[in-house]
Amino acid sequence: MSAPLSIEQDDLLTDDLKSWLSDIDFSNDNEEAIEMEPSDIEMSSPPIDIETSPPEEADVNLDDTWATVQKNGNNKLNRFILTFFPSDMDTKWLEPETYFENSPNKFDCWTGQYEYCPDTGKLHAHIYIECNHKHRIRFNVFHREIRKYHQSVQLQLAKRASKKQRQSAINYVTADFKRAPGSLVFRWEHNKFPSDFDPKCVNKKSKSDKVSKDEQHETQRLWIESKPRHWTWDQIVHENEESKKLLFGCTAGEKYHKGRHAEDARRTINDVIIFYGAGGTGKTTEAQAWGSEDEPVQECRYYRRNPDDGAFWGGGRTCYKGQRIVHYEEFAGQEAFGRLKEVCDIGKHGPAVNVKNGGALLNHDTVIFTSNIHPAGWFHKLWESDPKQWMPFERRITQVRFYPSHRADGSLNQPDENNPPYFIDQTEEFRQFVGDYDKAKEHAELHWPLKEAPEPTAQVFVPGRSHGVTENTFFEYCKTGRAP
């Protein structure tokens, strides 16, 4: 008489068997596929899912749970892994003759071993079985015969039929590290093909070596976070061999790294500083060192606005990356006046700007100008035609330094290790202009005169043209030898 009809499953085994399925899901190419009768292929691997097992205490009637596989109960079995929980490690439970008569005609392979579940410690058997195509057994018949001897029975059908699938399944049910102590692998003497463990076919995605996607993403995120924000993505990826291996296929990492500046709070523009005067007096060096006490890494705090970039604020490695100091070097009015007022608007946040292949928000608190020209000459044509435009610029200035060509003692103003840059603070003098551009020009004439407007260039007649061509006077002198 068969045992009571209750089906119990161990937690083992859902994870264990699903792992096997994912590990051996190889493509079924023609070279490795095992030949089947066309009518058999569809029926050989019915899609039966493993479901969560009911508690052991519950006595579930078989009819209640059979509905999940009843529609496939008449399907014929082909390749599958059998799992059951025997009462002991008697070898007979691993032999097909225990369950079926005339087994050599029914099966082509029957190989397995006893194992202990690492979590629950329960004894169970894993057996890989291949049925003979001409004498395949139906699912419900096979299940019923095994249930006569064991209470908990699970069948997991293979999704593919290939040599790789076969060897992977054999490796799964004969692995040494999982075998129960004191037991041996059972290899049926009537197997139609070798059923030995093949180390060359060990699955690279074994459960012990798997790293979930979440863990991998977290490792990548922490690696990116450990690098300075001003680094480019290429610098992070190619830092060393470990970074190349970790981030080679990380397509989202570059976008994540670019967005790290969003964590910084928006800064308010507080200072607009002007360093003007003679060349070689240390203006640029002072600008680059500004704020180094708070942030020693220059790339993190300092950005030099390159007038050659035009409307763009850099790109790639030269792109603006949220630095708090913006430096206009050798400034002579190259920036549009309206845009400059936005960049220097005290008490406001920086405007949005264009960067190559994207955009950015200026997040600076300090603007520094270094120039060999007095500030009154930067937009002199605009201010001479409309003097009232000087006031919006002047009220934004918070500090002015003049770097003369000579020191107070008459020596050249050339800074070195023993002589720091010499400058004169003219902040109060600029405040006395009170928006009067004429006073600014007078101040320039007194301290650092503006250059006179260049003389008009000569008009050179070119035969075949109806109008003169503007030509540099020096170029004309070189060609003719005569003063223009």
Swiss-Prot record:
One of its GO terms (cellular component) is host cell nucleus. One of its GO terms (biological process) is viral DNA genome replication. It is found in: Host nucleus. This is Replication-associated protein. It comes from Chaetoceros protobacilladnavirus 2. InterPro entries: P-loop_NTPase. Keywords: DNA replication, Host nucleus, Viral DNA replication. Transmembrane segments: none annotated. Plays an essential for the replication of viral DNA. Presumably cleaves viral genomic dsRNA replicative form to initiate rolling circle replication. A motif (Nuclear localization signal) lies at residues 146-153. It comes from the Viruses.
